[in-house]
Amino acid sequence: MEGLEENGGVVQVGELLPCKICGRTFFPVALKKHGPICKKTATKKRKTFDSSRQRAEGTDIPTVKPLKPRPEPPKKPSNWRRKHEEFIATIRAAKGLDQALKEGGKLPPPPPPSYDPDYIQCPYCQRRFNENAADRHINFCKEQAARISNKGKFSTDTKGKPTSRTQYKPPALKKSNSPGTASSGSSRLPQPSGAGKTVVGVPSGKVSSSSSSLGNKLQTLSPSHKGIAAPHAVANVKPRNSTPPSLARNPAPGVLTNKRKTYTESYIYRPDGDSASSLNGGNIKGIEGNSPGNLSKFCHECGTKYPVEWAKFCCECGIRRMIL
């Protein structure tokens, strides 16, 4: 071996010798120093370096203990052979079905259903789930089965009883106005006095007799006077000049009928939508034309709402506004 010059001197070097612990080769002089150090490092385990603890030194951050690794769950044995056999059985069943369809013979029975033995079967619906899904499903399926059984009991109990039907109630009939109430509504309108007015060309006796006959008819037709005797029977006893008891007791109905006749006969409908009635030779506009509550708010033809209250025609179809 050639010598190496070190610090101006020549050092004689022998052959390289391997270390018994780590297997590296050293010169004999260096191997004597390396042997005890290598033996010491081999026996002593080195701690793993944690950089988070080094960064947390000198600060208020508490040192967090490292999380221990969770042990891995044991692996279940694979049932590859069973899966392989089920796969072959399904292929053979499909081939047998195709052959039976071609030949036109009877169809073979379907293969039995396959299931995974690792899955847990639900005792209520007979389905299978893995462990996590089975824990959630079984509780839900239990409550659902209890509800369905309760409904079945209730239906069997009420099976013999007839179903209750809601009885139809007819709408309440509106009370028809009696002659007394009709007189209050019609008395607001300006009407001629029937007592003092005489018809031209007709004797006064005929007018009084016609008014009395109308009053008698109203009195006999009204339900409140059913028990009273007919006034014409009393008229035979009393003289003709005296007024009959029907007019003496209640003279208003005869006058009201005359007023009502004159009002209805003189009712005129104008083409512009206003209604007028001629009383005592004068024209008076009807209440229906003036009050907005009696006019329809929507068109009866197209259903469009009138933009203003005083509109007379529909702005969409042009139909005249209807008076209710």
Swiss-Prot record:
Keyword Zinc: yes
InterPro entries for this protein: ZC2HC1A/B-like, Znf_C2HC_C3H
Secretion signal, residue range per the UniProt entry: none
Keywords linked to the UniProt accession: Metal-binding, Phosphoprotein, Repeat, Zinc, Zinc-finger
Residues noted as binding Zn(2+) 1 in the record, renumbered to the chain: 19, 22, 34, 38
Cofactor(s) in the UniProt record: Zn(2+)
Record-listed Phosphothreonine modification sites: 243
UniProt protein name: Zinc finger C2HC domain-containing protein 1A
Biased composition (Low complexity): 176-187, 196-215
Biased composition, class Basic and acidic residues, residue ranges: 48-58
Zinc finger C2HC/C3H-type: from-to: 15-44, 118-147
Residue numbers binding Zn(2+) 2: 122, 125, 137, 141
Pfam families noted in UniProt: zf-C2HC_2
GO MF assignments: zinc ion binding
Region feature (Disordered): 43-83, 150-224, 236-259
Family: Belongs to the ZC2HC1 family.
Positions where Phosphoserine occurs in the chain: 222, 291
